[in-house]
């Protein structure tokens, strides 16, 4: 049953006016700009965030719906772009490390949407996330690991794919450096929230009901960092809308980037 538009509007207004309701129903809410990376570190330390079982369950329910739609032949734009970025490498059945894999759903996305599939490994710093990933995909390789200290040798994977985790890493510079180190051929930074005309900032918000930290990156800084760590921009895609200008005062969007790794001479 579809409710009339006026009732839907009233319902949304009621939800947004109640902190308890909006945190239980809305995916992301209660944004606040933080003053520094140090404040962001403190905010992360004070909350279980992505480590909490309740947060993991809520995120998982949301992505199960996306996977179901994909299986019906209706993949959301970000899933299609992720597969397109892997395909744009030109590699056949590449080895792919996903950094910040959550409950592992991109292993299913790549199996379904990348011709020839990939040899997938996923890592996440949340033991709860990895436990759920192993439950869902018992034949796939998952490890508990930190994006800023990847437990792999240099050039271990054809592609390092950072799905939606770079936006939650305060030490994003280190995470980019580690991705470049472990990648043998390519790095993909997917659905990265960026400003085109403003500096990098840190936000605190509630995601799936839990307080987390988010980074909106200055696009020019992101590309400069990648170049600094031996990566060359090959292609970029506009991804799903994500404008937090109501909070920051500056328009933002999400983009996906394919970088090749420059060979040392």
Model-derived regions: residue spans:
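Conserved class I S-adenosyl-L-methionine
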Residues: 4-90, 94-102, 188-216
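Class I SAM-dependent methyltransferase SAM/SAH-binding core
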Residues: 103-148
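Short conserved loop adjoining the S-adenosyl-L-methionine
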Residues: 149-154
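A short SAM/SAH-binding and catalytic strip from SAM-dependent methyltransferases
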Residues: 159-171
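A short glycine-rich, Lys/Arg-flanked "PGG" loop and its adjoining helix->strand segment in the class I
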Residues: 173-186
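Short alpha-helix
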Residues: 213-236
